[in-house]
Amino acid sequence: RRREPPFQFWSRIKGLAMSHLMNTYARLPVAFSHGDGSWVTDTDGKIYLDALSGIAVSTLGHNHPELVAAIAAQAGRLLHTSNLYRMPQQEQLADKLTALAGMDEVFFCNSGCEANEAAIKLARFYGHQHGVDSPAIIVMEKAFHGRTMATLSATGNRKTQAGFEPLVSGFVRVPYNDLD
């Protein structure tokens, strides 16, 4: 028996129109229209504390005037180019980050998933460069790493992985706080 997707269930319960978005998350029955700082407002005007600060790539909260102005100013000059070209602002930021972190280089990503995917590749590359034929990467049980094939394979949730087998091998799962 096929289970009804969660959004269809809530649409039926709340009388919401079905969305044309692919149902990849079990969405909650709330729609946000705007935010300010750590607060978000839904389409009914109810205000919530956003304890996640916008989650993932928006960790600075919502609608900060200086950030909005900086984004608008940059969008008015140049929004994005390929990494095939040099970008002075990107290089200036890389200089600052490497100085602060005491590192030699940085790798800018569009998402946490892309960052995790790059970390997996770098770890495997390092292993191969040091004579390890099948490098293994330690990941935490029940952790979420992303939805690409490699990051999904690293994710410690069988429910999230179901239906996408065969998964990428080379991950060793350990429980949190187990230092042995």
Language model features with spans:
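Glycine-rich loop-to-alpha-helix module at the N-terminal edge of alpha/beta enzyme cores
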Residues: 19, 47-132
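PLP-dependent aspartate aminotransferase-fold enzymes
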Residues: 95-180
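Short, acidic, Ser/Thr-enriched surface-loop or helix-capping motifs
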Residues: 42-43
